[in-house]
């Protein structure tokens, strides 16, 4: 760990070229310039060969350590020379007042290996038909060479008309560059493009800001998506381009260096932006070298190859995680600089509120519009704790929406020159706790503190998780971004508008005696990720030290530490344990100890799930957590030693169901005949409403024949499917396979067999998007299941094609048997790679080994499934050790991802 670990502004060691020198001597000979090509070489086949040689040379040079900047310049020059040679070959130099102009990225001179080559054929007057045909042949040849050429053929007047009407065309023209042809014509175009009649700065600037905002929204306003677009994601190359476009239009600056001369960029900021651009260029260049066609997305299947090409080291996914950590940190810096510089441009170009005087807030700060500003630009350097005073001011003053550009510049400067972390200053610690105690702590202070790297400057541990990704399909965000989203979700529980989505949490949150302790637990719940070891245990220790430093008493410190250590407990218990088993509830309640701790924990659990992945939270998970919460609350109120009377519960369920059925004037004798066939477990694990629903239909049905019921009301957050059928081997596998083939995910299964051998199985299913089964699919699913039940012999179900994304993940199959309080059941946990037909395959193995399944709880976590199965042997007893071992071997063999889902 380096001495500047609390500094968020240090350049990653891999930012220029990890483990390799930059700009080493060329390892292969530079291909000849296209200007030297003889006429007989200017055919498609020969030119293709020359282009392939040049691409190979680019790759070889890059791998030998030559900088991306030099190779981008080299490709731009090579394409310039090729187009110049072809321009003369086609005789365009003889056409008066005609020019070939590079526009867009090509105009900027930024040609990566697969970049588009955008050109404009510019003429004073419309081309003749003959000349137009010749231009068509020229462009067709470029396309035949497999170059990504975008072209337009326009007169000067057409260019100006199109440019005035379309900001994208205008931007292309602003960064246009002459390749060959009539220089005077090109200069005339430039003169018009940079005149106030074309796109005045006062119109161009807001248009580019709106364009950037729209682009950011497409990427959910974060560069932290785990498959980012290097060019277009927030903090990517486009954000640097936006600065250059505005500077070029307003100041005439053609580079970052020239922006320093105009006084709108300091030398340090220029250097930082160049570092960021250089890093992003290296990643983009490497990505283009491994792809067959143009794309800028760092998809999962590309990340390892790019990381290896950039010489990131480590086992397994470590190279990817290191590269992506550097990427996210760089994009954070670009985003902050982009925000600050655009605000400076805003003042210079639009001169907003120039006449409005700043309004003093106190001796240190003032308001400019709705932005907080320093009254003494050296305050942060002289008194670093004033940084925390500013954020405490922001949390208390709802009129403040952000930080003024020059103050942000001073904040960045002071941040870099901190002698020690801010949390070492007593006043800063007091201010931090005051911030946490405010109802709007997250949105008004912690979020901007994170955005401007002040959280990192305050507590060095935070810096460890900034940009920390996890190479899986479950975690949609980096650890720091996820943590901020947890905090925002917790703050939303204080808002009545959140009640429809989270009724329980909105009810409980105001009853928490100290919400700041929950925020502190959220801040630390994943702080130890990426360090090795159990992140929950390590984080619990970290927060104890933090609590001691910040003056929390023993009770407060122990509560926060317990929340961090047990932040996964409620989620795991609800989703991967049998929460209808009183012993499970009793064990969970013993760990929780009090209703107050239960309220804190359920709030943290819900926020954690919601902030992990946008698709993760659904009504099924909500119903599980509510069920666990209320069962635990009841247990805590009853007392830990008092377990529920199961016989009384069975009796109560039967009486309640009977009362419901009597309203329908049912035949009670026939009902008694059906119920007498059922074991006590059936009544214990179904609600009175479920029992009545089953009975109504069974009373009207030939009970010796199969019956499939699909509930029209979402039950426990999903659609309930009830199956009544003569029991037989492979029945569960057949049903699970049919549901999987219909693209339904099973989340829960309750398996019962009547005294006379009838299967009475209940499945809770969801659509792929987490919603209950669509009404228009009910009849089709019911018919398909009836067909499966009537088949005399089990047939392996046809399996859906696996998701392409699953190809890039390997999850070892793990089988674990949980300790139980009974000798009648075994509780088996299974972790494996998610794959089509998985549940059916598992069911086949159970049937092969003559095991009976009594319940299943299915959790899909990204590319991984983590399931719980309740099993018994053929004698209705718990599995003996030798049978457990055999089952483990069969499951591991059948679900091995290397056999089932090919890895790239």
Swiss-Prot record:
Residues 7-23 have a biased composition (Low complexity). GO terms for molecular function: [protein-PII] uridylyltransferase activity; phosphoric diester hydrolase activity. One of its GO terms (biological process) is regulation of nitrogen utilization. Its EC number is 2.7.7.59, 3.1.4.-. Has four distinct domains: an N-terminal nucleotidyltransferase (NT) domain responsible for UTase activity, a central HD domain that encodes UR activity, and two C-terminal ACT domains that seem to have a role in glutamine sensing. NCBIfam families: PRK01759.1, PRK05007.1, UTase_glnD. This is Bifunctional uridylyltransferase/uridylyl-removing enzyme. The gene is glnD.
């Amino acid at each position: 760990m380096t001495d500047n670990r609390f500094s968020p502004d240090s350049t990653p060691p891999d930012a220029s070229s990890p483990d390799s020198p930059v700009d080493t001597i060329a390892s292969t000979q530079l291909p000849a310039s296209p200007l030297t090509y003889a006429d007989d070489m200017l055919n498609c086949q020969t030119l293709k060969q020359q282009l392939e040689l040049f691409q190979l040379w680019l790759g070889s040079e890059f791998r030998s350590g030559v900088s991306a900047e030099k190779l981008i310049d080299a490709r731009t020059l090579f394409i310039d020379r090729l187009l110049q040679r072809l321009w003369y070959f086609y005789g365009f130099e003889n056409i008066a007042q005609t020019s070939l102009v590079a526009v867009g990225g090509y105009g900027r001179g930024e040609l990566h290996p697969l970049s588009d080559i955008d050109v404009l054929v510019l003429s004073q007057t419309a081309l003749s038909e003959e000349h137009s045909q010749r231009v068509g042949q020229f462009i067709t040849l470029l396309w035949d060479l497999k170059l990504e050429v975008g072209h337009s053929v326009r007169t000067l007047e057409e260019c100006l008309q199109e440019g005035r009407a379309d900001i994208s065309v205008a931007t292309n023209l602003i960064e246009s560059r002459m390749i060959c042809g009539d220089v005077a014509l090109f200069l005339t175009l430039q003169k018009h493009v940079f005149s106030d009649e074309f796109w005045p700065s006062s119109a161009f600037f807001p248009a580019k800001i709106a364009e950037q905002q729209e682009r950011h929204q497409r990427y959910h306003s974060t560069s932290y998506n785990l498959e980012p677009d290097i060019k277009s994601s927030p903090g990517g190359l486009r954000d640097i381009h936006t600065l250059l476009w505005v500077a070029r239009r307003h100041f005439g600056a053609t580079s970052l260096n020239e922006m320093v001369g105009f006084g709108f960029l300091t030398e340090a900021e220029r250097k930082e932006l160049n570092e960021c651009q250089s890093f992003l260029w290296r990643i983009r260049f490497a990505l283009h070298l491994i792809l067959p066609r143009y794309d800028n997305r760092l998809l999962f299947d590309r990340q390892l190859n790019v990381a290896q090409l950039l010489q990131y080291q480590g086992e397994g996914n470590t190279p990817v995680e290191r590269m992506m950590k550097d990427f996210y940190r760089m994009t954070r810096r670009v985003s902050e600089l982009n925000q600050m510089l655009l605000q400076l441009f805003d003042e210079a170009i639009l001169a907003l509120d120039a006449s409005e005087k700043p309004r003093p807030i106190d001796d240190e700060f003032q308001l400019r519009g709705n932005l907080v500003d320093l009254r003494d630009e050296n305050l942060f350097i002289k008194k670093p704790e004033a940084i925390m005073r500013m954020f405490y001011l922001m949390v208390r003053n709802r009129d403040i929406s952000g930080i003024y550009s020059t103050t942000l510049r001073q904040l960045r400067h002071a941040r870099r020159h901190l002698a020690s972390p801010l949390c070492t200053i007593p006043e800063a610690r007091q201010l931090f706790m005051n911030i946490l105690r405010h109802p709007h702590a997250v949105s008004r202070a912690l979020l901007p503190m994170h955005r401007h790297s002040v959280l990192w400057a305050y507590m060095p541990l935070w810096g460890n998780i900034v940009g920390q990704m996890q190479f899986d399909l479950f975690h949609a965000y980096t650890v720091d971004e996820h943590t901020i989203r947890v905090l925002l979700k917790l703050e939303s529980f204080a808002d009545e508008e959140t009640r429809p989505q989270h009724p329980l949490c909105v009810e409980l949150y105001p009853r928490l005696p100290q919400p700041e302790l929950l925020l502190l637990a959220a801040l630390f719940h994943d702080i130890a990720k990426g360090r090795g070891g159990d992140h929950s245990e390590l984080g619990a220790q970290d927060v104890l030290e933090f609590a001691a430093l910040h003056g929390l008493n023993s009770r407060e410190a122990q509560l926060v530490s317990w929340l961090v250590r047990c932040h996964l407990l409620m989620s795991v218990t609800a989703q991967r344990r049998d929460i209808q088993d009183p012993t499970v509830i009793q064990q969970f309640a013993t760990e929780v100890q009090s209703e107050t701790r239960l309220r804190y924990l359920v709030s943290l659990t819900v926020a954690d799930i919601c902030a992990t992945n946008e698709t993760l939270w659904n009504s099924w998970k909500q119903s599980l957590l509510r069920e666990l919460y209320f069962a635990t609350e009841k247990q805590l109120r009853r007392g830990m030693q008092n377990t529920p009377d199961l016989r009384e519960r069975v009796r109560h369920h039967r009486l309640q169901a009977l009362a419901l059925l009597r309203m329908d004037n049912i035949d009670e004798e026939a009902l008694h005949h059906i119920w007498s066939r059922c074991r006590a477990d059936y009544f214990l694990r179904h609600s009175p409403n479920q029992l009545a629903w089953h009975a109504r239909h069974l009373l009207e049905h030939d009970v010796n024949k199969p019956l499939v019921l699909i509930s029209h009301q979402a039950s426990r957050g999903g659609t309930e499917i009830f199956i009544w059928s003569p029991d037989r081997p492979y029945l569960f596998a057949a049903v699970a396979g049919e549901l999987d083939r219909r693209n339904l995910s099973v989340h829960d299964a309750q398996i019962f067999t009547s005294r006379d051998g009838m299967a009475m199985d209940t499945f809770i299913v969801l659509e792929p998007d987490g919603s209950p089964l669509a009404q228009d699919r009910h009849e089709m699913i019911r018919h398909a299941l009836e067909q499966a039940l009537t088949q005399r012999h089990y047939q392996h179900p046809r399996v859906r094609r696996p998701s392409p994304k699953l190809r890039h993940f390997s999850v070892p199959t793990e089988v674990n048997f949980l300790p139980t309080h009974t000798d009648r059941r075994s509780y088996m946990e299974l972790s494996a790679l998610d794959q089509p037909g998985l549940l059916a395959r598992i069911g086949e193995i159970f049937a092969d080994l003559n095991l009976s399944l009594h319940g299943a709880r299915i959790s899909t976590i990204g590319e991984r499934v983590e399931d719980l199965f309740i099993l018994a042997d053929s004698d209705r007893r718990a599995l003996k050790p030798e049978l457990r071992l055999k089952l483990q071997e069969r499951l591991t063999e059948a679900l091995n991802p290397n056999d089932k889902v090919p890895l790239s």
